[in-house]
From Swiss-Prot:
Gene: lysX
Protein keywords: Aminoacyl-tRNA synthetase, Antibiotic resistance, ATP-binding, Cell membrane, DNA-binding, Ligase, Lipid metabolism, Magnesium, Membrane, Metal-binding, Multifunctional enzyme, Nucleotide-binding, Transferase, Transmembrane, Transmembrane helix, Virulence
Polar residues: bias regions: 19-33
Record: residues binding Mg(2+) 2: 1093
Membrane topology: Multi-pass membrane protein
Keyword Lipid metabolism: yes
EC number: 6.1.1.6, 2.3.2.3
Co-factor requirement: Mg(2+)
Entry's Gene Ontology BP terms: lipid metabolic process; lysyl-tRNA aminoacylation; response to antibiotic
Tree of life domain: Bacteria
Species whose genome carries this gene: Mycobacterium tuberculosis (strain KZN 1435 / MDR)
GO CC annotation: cytosol; plasma membrane
Protein's name according to its UniProt entry: Lysylphosphatidylglycerol biosynthesis bifunctional protein LysX
Length: 1174
């Protein structure tokens, strides 16, 4: 019936439902393990604990998370109090009846009111355990709003009212008797009226169960009780007449002593009444146990239910480490109406405990939770959840429950796991001890274990268990060796004599994870055995395809951790002390410390409930479900006992589910729409839906909308240049369609251009123009075959004789006239921009031409192209902030290169006299008109040359690139003209041929300042000049850095025509040789055009002693916190000590060269620049 055996009745909600709640007490994952919890962060859950209270307690607000969401129960009514009032009334009588049956003193104290109540109001015999048990069940059922309890109580009141009415009508009673009968009749009438008016408050049903089996048990117990009672009466008859002894015994055993004692002449000994009632109670208790167990067994998982759950796990089970435990067979299940999510649960003492998160599609979780809450309401259960993740708790909260964090689950990431380091010292020492004892570890899937060997494994697991029963509910599977669990993992520790001393069994967590289910060890196993198994599993996880391991759950982890911290508050210390005290029985602290030593990722899990006032009842349900409190005759099913499948008919009708519980065909589930079912279907715009519908019609007609390709004979440009009547086939995208009935015109575009195609019914080999119009949309890719001709207006056209669809466009293209106007949209959907924008395609072509021209120019001069590492152990070659990444294999940080310079110089040492690299570089800096964090960089080195040699070389590279992209050595510059028709933006060509100006840095700054400076100008003077010119500087900068700042603010940004600025201060050029004749400057130049630096060149520093001194200065800056300073690269310095020839080096930003040549920003010239996240 799902009614608890408790006598107390909880408080009431205003809406009339019994208060519902859940509190998760400690629960076991295995024999010695407390329940576990998992892997989402607690972001998104609101918290009620204030910072002040948190500080006072000395614990984090997360550990006392309480949320108060909207109510999930029925609305209020005028008679919401009736079930609780009826339950409390009957419960008080049940309690007093039980106490009177036990204690003669209480029986004497309540004798007078008991007799009055028994005679006129309600059956209240002096001693009867059976009647006390019946009333207790009735009180619990009334409180749970069971409709059958309402019917029983109403029938009792009606029958009592009829009896009182008959007595009143008969008359002849004393004044006291008349008063009692009239008062009783009035009370009964009022009770009947109240019960009838409160009928709708008793909505709860009773679950199906073995009613006839329970009745048979009661009947057998009753017969045995009557016979035994009759025998006792015969032995101790007292004053009871012989012919009344059997009836007296039957009245006390099965009649609940309801018959008037005056009907019997005489009495047996008083102690016999209690024994007779006890016999009746035993019969009822036995029947109730059979009924309750049958309710659970009959409504537990069926094979079809488990098969459906496994299908959902295969489709959606990658996120929840507890998902596989939903296949535990002593649970029941409720599905969302779509079948795409479900919740497994068990009912204990009137509490419906959901096991963790819903299983299935996250989008269908609210449906599943709603179905579960409706089920709880239907049967009058209090809803509760154990072990929900943050995402699951948020879903339950949105459905009206409250979330409380219980603790954290330990998650190991094998990619980050290592035994080295001081924090792993304890584990490392334990593993060493186990290995010295000769232990080895064997890891296998259950499917790879022979039946006889698995039988031995089960025997060992049972013999090593230190409790009488298996523990666990939400975080334990409850079975071992089942064929359906073939993917489970078994880890065994084996001694030198090939004897198994310990084992771990782990269930699948998606396809790449495992979750601990069972942990056993022999009493003879040495210390460190468990640590050895866990470490070996983590270290060899990659070979098993495992990327995450869920270990045990640490209940109240935050309390242990924060209560032990320095400065913890008194309440936090007291709370930790209580947990340590209770750890003597429930191993709370032991589990926390046993998990903590592996340095896991701690992930919170939550309990959810509806109202805090019944937390004790839900706590009792939790410990019963987890096995810490074992009820008599309880059992845990390892086979299917359910007879009533919960799978939605829509899913069951597919025939994909298996009666043995094995997983269904996942591809079949996808085909029947389980991945896109009712209620949460993919929402698409109307135009997209129309195109999807058209695609389905094409497929149903046998047309492949995405066929295998075949090369066309001509591009569009080639077709337009072909002779009249030439046979051609072209492929492209439909940009426009004009339908004139029997004749249809379309614009077809490929990379080379756009042309008109003409479909005339009279010239098509098969079909008609209408077929083309019906099958295609703008944006579709088609292949056209025919001959070249012209339309009536003389427009060159392809006269189509045949066509086929080669790619269905399922989304509409942007506006055919305006294209994509939003710059961000053009960046994010570059593929669309290229499809509709001819200028974007021209930029891609221009960029390709620039890259090709640069390579060809260098190849013509005998340069060798190489590739150097992008992932580097040190960041060097330039002063810039690097990107940092991490390599798991060696457990160390790496940097994305900011420049390939140091590796290319190693090649120069090796004798590669002319070398270049054209590749990607990365700098963790700003994003603007001319900067992108990822860019293309050219670095070239020529032996026996200097920086002046590269002035001509660089100019030649850029001019050749401009020639290749624009057809002439010109650069395109944006211009804005204002006229009568408004402002017009356009690009204007600028000639960049010939020789470009060369100026020294100090001369250019002097001209800008109007005051002469040189390399000998003092720092104080330079600072005064900065102040006068409004140029900012830092006090720690030297003179060279101040000069560079003046150059960037006054010279670089004002430069228009390409200009080489040479001879920079030595201090800002750490990899450049000093000038051969000028003190204080280095042989370096920067090329600037229109305010943007395009490249730089050095006479490379080849003196290894001076190079070491400069890099040591840079490393000191890096150690002092400068993120852009270069680190000391000993490998590079050692290579330099083998002597590098005099070399000139060039570095040039290809993206900026493309900007110069095309007149566009860096974001426009890159196919896919970095875009801000949505």
């Amino acid at each position: 019936m799902g009614v608890g055996l408790h006598l107390t009745v909880p408080g009431l909600r205003r809406d009339g439902r019994g208060v519902q709640s859940n509190s998760h007490d400690t629960s076991s994952k295995t024999t010695a393990d407390i329940s576990r919890c998992p892997q989402h962060t607690d972001a998104g859950l609101q918290r009620a604990a204030t910072p002040g209270i948190s500080r006072l307690l000395g614990i984090s607000s997360r550990s006392v998370t309480l949320t108060k969401p909207r109510s999930a129960t029925r609305g209020n009514s005028r008679y919401h109090w009736v079930p609780a009032a009826a339950g409390w009334t009957v419960g008080v009588i049940a309690t007093l009846s039980l106490l009177a049956s036990v204690s003669p003193l209480i029986r004497w104290i309540i004798k007078v009111p008991r007799e009055f109540i028994n005679d006129y109001l309600f059956n209240f015999p002096d001693t009867n355990f059976a009647w006390s048990f019946v009333l207790a069940l009735l009180a619990a059922a009334l409180t749970a709003r069971k409709r059958i309890a309402w019917l029983v109580l109403l029938a009792n009141m009606v029958l009592a009212a009829v009896v009182n009415a008959a007595e009143i009508a008969a008359g002849g009673n004393t004044a006291a008797e008349s008063f009692g009968e009239n008062l009783g009749f009035a009370v009964h009438v009022v009770a009947i009226v109240v019960l009838v008016l409160g009928y709708r408050e008793f909505w709860a049903k009773v679950r199906r169960g073995a009613l006839f089996r329970a009745a048979a048990v009661w009947l057998a117990g009753a017969v045995v009780g009557i016979v035994a009672s009759w025998g006792l009466v015969e032995l101790f008859p007292g004053s009871l007449a012989p012919d009344e002894r059997l009836g007296y015994a039957a009245n006390r055993v099965v009649g609940f002593a309801l018959a008037d004692p005056d009907l019997f002449t005489g009495r047996p000994h008083v102690f016999l009444n209690a024994i007779f009632g006890l016999f009746g109670a035993f019969a009822l208790i036995g029947a109730a146990i059979v009924l309750f167990l049958s309710q659970r067994a009959d409504n537990a998982l069926t094979g079809e239910d488990e098969s459906a759950i496994r299908g959902l796990l295969d489709l959606y089970g990658k996120d929840d480490s507890l998902g596989y435990f939903a296949t535990r067979r002593d649970k029941s299940v409720v599905f969302a109406s779509s079948g795409r999510a479900c919740i497994t649960y068990r009912v204990e003492v009137g509490v419906c405990l959901a096991s963790g998160d819903p299983v299935g599609d996250h989008r269908a979780w609210p449906q599943a939770v709603d179905a579960w809450l409706r089920l709880c309401q239907t049967y009058g259960w209090a809803p509760g959840v154990m072990g929900a993740s943050s995402q699951g708790a948020q879903t339950y909260r949105e459905a009206g429950l409250t979330a409380l964090e219980l603790g954290d689950e330990a998650i190991l990431r094998p990619a980050d796991f290592k035994l080295s380091g001081p924090e792993m010292r304890g584990v490392r020492q334990a593993v060493t001890r186990a290995r010295r004892a000769g232990l080895t570890v064997r890891i296998r899937r259950h499917r790879d274990i022979a039946e006889d060997e698995m039988a031995q494994t089960i025997t060992r697991a049972d013999s090593w268990r230190d409790t009488e029963t298996e523990r666990g509910f939400s975080m334990a599977l409850g079975r071992l060796g089942d064929p359906a669990d073939s993917d489970c993992l078994l880890v065994e520790a084996i001694d030198p004599h090939n004897q198994v001393l310990a084992m771990l069994s782990l269930v699948p967590w998606g396809t790449t994870g495992v979750s601990l289910d069972l942990m056993r060890r022999s009493p003879q196993s040495p210390n460190g055995t468990i640590e050895l198994m866990v470490s070996e599993l983590a270290l060899h996880a990659e070979s098993l395809g495992i990327t995450r391991i869920s270990l045990n759950f640490a209940v109240f982890r935050a309390a242990f951790e924060q209560g032990a911290q320095l400065g913890a508050g008194p309440v936090a210390r007291l709370w930790r002390g209580l947990l340590v005290f209770f750890s003597r029985w429930w191993q709370l602290e032991t589990l926390y410390r046993s998990n903590m030593k592996y340095q896991p990722e701690w992930v919170p899990r939550y309990a959810c409930y509806e109202d805090a006032r019944v937390i004790p009842r839900v706590g009792v349900a939790s410990v019963i479900a987890e096995g810490f409190l074992v009820l008599p005759f309880s059992r845990r099913n390892r086979v299917h006992t359910g007879h009533h499948p919960a799978v939605p008919e829509r899913l069951a009708a597919t025939g994909l589910l298996h009666h043995d519980g094995s997983a269904p065909d996942v591809s079949g589930l996808r085909q029947v729409g389980l991945t896109n079912g009712d209620g949460v279907e993919r929402r698409l715009p109307e135009q997209v839906r129309v195109r999807f519908d058209k695609l389905e019609k094409l497929r149903s007609s046998g047309i492949d909308a995405f066929p295998v390709g075949r090369p066309p004979s001509h591009t569009v440009a080639q077709a337009l240049a072909a002779d009249h009547q030439a046979s051609v086939s072209v492929s492209g995208r439909i940009m426009r369609i004009r339908n004139y009935g029997g004749v249809l015109f379309a614009q077809l575009r490929d990379w080379s251009g756009e042309m008109q195609v003409l479909l005339d019914n009279s010239r098509l080999d098969q079909g008609c123009a209408a077929d083309f119009n019906a099958a295609t949309d703008l944006g579709d890719l088609v292949e056209m075959t025919g001959h070249m001709g012209a339309s009536k207006t003389g427009t060159p056209s392809l006269i189509v004789s045949g066509w086929r669809l080669i790619g269905k466009c399922l989304r509409p293209l942007p506006n055919k006239w305006k294209g994509l106007l939003d710059p961000e949209a053009r960046v994010r959907t570059r593929y669309l921009d290229l499809a509709v924008n001819a200028e974007s395609r021209a930029l891609i072509t221009a960029r390709s031409s620039v890259l090709r021209a640069v390579r060809e120019t260098l190849f013509a001069k005998g340069f060798v192209e190489v590739e150097t590492p992008i992932l580097q152990q040190l960041h060097g070659g330039a002063t810039a902030r690097p990107f940092v990444t991490h390599i798991n294999t060696y457990s160390m940080d790496l940097f994305l290169r900011i420049a390939p310079e140091l590796y290319l110089k190693r090649l120069c040492v090796g004798g590669v006299e002319r070398v270049f690299e054209l590749g990607r570089a990365f700098r963790n800096e700003g994003v603007d008109f001319s900067h992108n964090p990822e860019f293309t960089l050219l670095e070239a080195y020529q032996a026996h040359a200097d920086y002046l040699e590269w002035i001509d070389g660089c100019r030649e590279l850029i001019q050749n690139a401009a020639q290749a992209a624009n057809g002439a050595p010109i650069a395109m510059r944006p211009r804005t003209d204002k006229g009568s028709d408004g402002t017009r933006h356009h690009l204007e060509p600028v000639d960049i041929s010939g020789i470009w100006p060369v100026r020294t840095v100090h001369d250019a700054i002097s001209e800008a300042l109007g005051e002469r400076i040189d390399a000998d100008t003092g720092l104080t003077t330079l600072r005064k000049l900065c102040d006068a010119a409004g140029v900012p500087y830092r006090t720690q900068w030297d003179a060279g850095a101040v000069v560079l700042e003046l150059y960037e603010h006054l010279v670089e940004c004002r430069t228009e025509q390409p200009t080489f600025y040479i001879d920079f201060p030595t201090s800002v050029s750490p990899l450049t040789r000093p000038h051969r004749s000028k003190r204080g400057v280095a042989e370096r130049w920067d090329l600037v055009a229109w305010g943007i630096e395009l490249g730089t060149a050095y006479s490379e520093l080849t003196d290894p002693v001076e190079q070491r001194r400069r890099l040591q200065e840079q490393s000191l800056l890096a150690a002092g916190g400068d993120p852009e300073a270069m680190e000391l690269d000993e490998d590079f310095l050692q290579a330099m000590e083998y002597a590098m020839p005099p070399t000139g080096g060039l570095g040039m930003g290809i993206d900026r060269v493309v900007m110069l040549i095309t007149g566009r920003s860096i974001r426009e010239t890159l196919p896919f620049p970095l875009a801000k996240p949505h």
